[in-house]
Amino acid sequence: MIANCLNDKPLPVYGKGENVRDWLYVEDHCKAIDLIIRKGRVGEVYNIGGHNEMKNIDIVKLICKALDKPESLITYVTDRKGHDMRYAIDPTKIHNELGWLPETKFADGIQKTIRWYLDNRDWWEEIISGEYQNYYERMYAGR
């Protein structure tokens, strides 16, 4: 989304964008995985969640606003059949057993993520110019 927004490309949003996801900053996710590897019980499953559920459309609009881009870039595409409206993550176990909680507030994490895209444009533009672009076009063509 951020790359498309920076390049003034369509921002595909499934259905009306009402799908809810639990958002977590990548460094918090990595720290949780590291903690599980070091202190988790072998064979156990630990859900990693941010306690931060938001609608997809709200995230996309937030990105547009942060980058001073028009919401007219948002393109509503046909939702996948059977697409879940909400992905709920219950991270109670990792908190209770390992003491993990996310450290980064959503507002800070999204700003850091956007800043990363701005500071590393050469890197990610090379990636999306190749095979990924072909995949992206196959996935969203005609939707």
Explain the meaning of each model-derived region.
Residues 2-143:
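C-terminal substrate-binding subdomain of Rossmann-fold SDR/epimerase-dehydratase oxidoreductases
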